[in-house]
């Protein structure tokens, strides 16, 4: 067991890291274009932050959190998602006193004790954005557009934007009563998890993917869009109107409720149907009570999160290659102790000039070192042996063109720039 990563986790090896860099750099670039600034919050938070915001009876809190008691007898939890920590950060640092709205993005690992499967891990990575301090429907559309632009920048197509409104405290209670009455005669046909959801928050039954529950829900289930108050209905209509004006196609999904208690009004997901059961690439919505729930003043918010592992799965299916491996500039080959010492000085000079370079310190033969230079896929090899040292020169070989240059050591810096560019 000591030689294996824990179940549900995954090592990222050097040959894979360039894909991750591409995902992260694209996220940063798109976020900056939209005026978002990066925030970083702790890997673990007080457990109460999640029980109060995400919902004590939600699947995340009741089944999936990694919670522990520290030596100070405090209950702490590895963050299962990023919105609640972002809201806590907003309150703790009194950012409600700054000009509103404030716009953040974050990238980092999250943790949930979930059943590992394709694209789903117990330690996974999310890119998310949050906007605090705006009630306007334009803000909802802006974060949706940012998410769609992110996918487009990665080359993903064939995606669908699903949309719904989950109402607010004022209009949701009547809907929950109707939904509870509707499910009352169907409780024998729903799974055990949904029975628990039925007792605490019947809306979550709509989110179940199990066939028995989908059949129990049926086509006659009450839809929340028919119970929205005037404010929520107007907001939802405006969101749809703006999406249409931007030529952004969407599908109304009346069963889209998201799995977290803090959502209000707009809820959305971007899905890739060809992925199968785990087709959601990312999603989010509005959370107008979350900041207040975290101890701050009443402050509206909206945001999304997207799973990077799920995106990599989608890219693989679409055969989109994000490899952006930076090529090594120089591979140093030296034979003999004096030559090695001189080569080590030149190695430092090359790096100071901004070129990447490695040197074989293992005292292999010239032939063995040349093989390693080829395997390293370097642009140039620099060769320094006794003969070159006696002549105060070195040999630089263009590994692609096969051309070789003799470079005097006294003009090394100038010639390196000419040769390597």
Curated annotation (Swiss-Prot):
Name the Pfam families for this protein. HGTP_anticodon, tRNA-synt_His
Q: Which Gene3D superfamilies match?
A: Anticodon-binding domain, Bira Bifunctional Protein, Domain 2
The GO annotation for biological process reads:
histidyl-tRNA aminoacylation
EC number(s) recorded for this UniProt protein:
6.1.1.21
Q: Which UniProt keywords apply?
A: Aminoacyl-tRNA synthetase, ATP-binding, Cytoplasm, Ligase, Nucleotide-binding, Protein biosynthesis
**Which PROSITE patterns does this chain map to?**
AA_TRNA_LIGASE_II (PS50862)
Superkingdom of origin organism: Bacteria
Provide the protein's localization.
Cytoplasm
Q: Which InterPro entries match?
A: aa-tRNA-synth_II, aa-tRNA-synth_II/BPL/LPL, Anticodon-bd, Anticodon-bd_dom_sf, His-tRNA-ligase, HisRS-like_core, HisRS/HisZ, HisRS_anticodon
GO CC annotations, alphabetized: cytoplasm
- Give yes or no: UniProt keyword ATP-binding: yes
MF terms from GO for this chain are: ATP binding; catalytic activity, acting on a protein; histidine-tRNA ligase activity; transferase activity
Q: What is its main location?
A: cytoplasm
Coiled-coil stretches, from where to where? none
Provide the reaction this enzyme catalyses: tRNA(His) + L-histidine + ATP = L-histidyl-tRNA(His) + AMP + diphosphate + H(+)
Name the top EC class: ligase
The record's listing under NCBIfam families reads:
hisS
Assembly = Homodimer.
What family does this chain come from, according to its entry? Answer: Belongs to the class-II aminoacyl-tRNA synthetase family.
| The protein's name | Histidine--tRNA ligase
| Organism of derivation | Natranaerobius thermophilus (strain ATCC BAA-1301 / DSM 18059 / JW/NM-WN-LF)
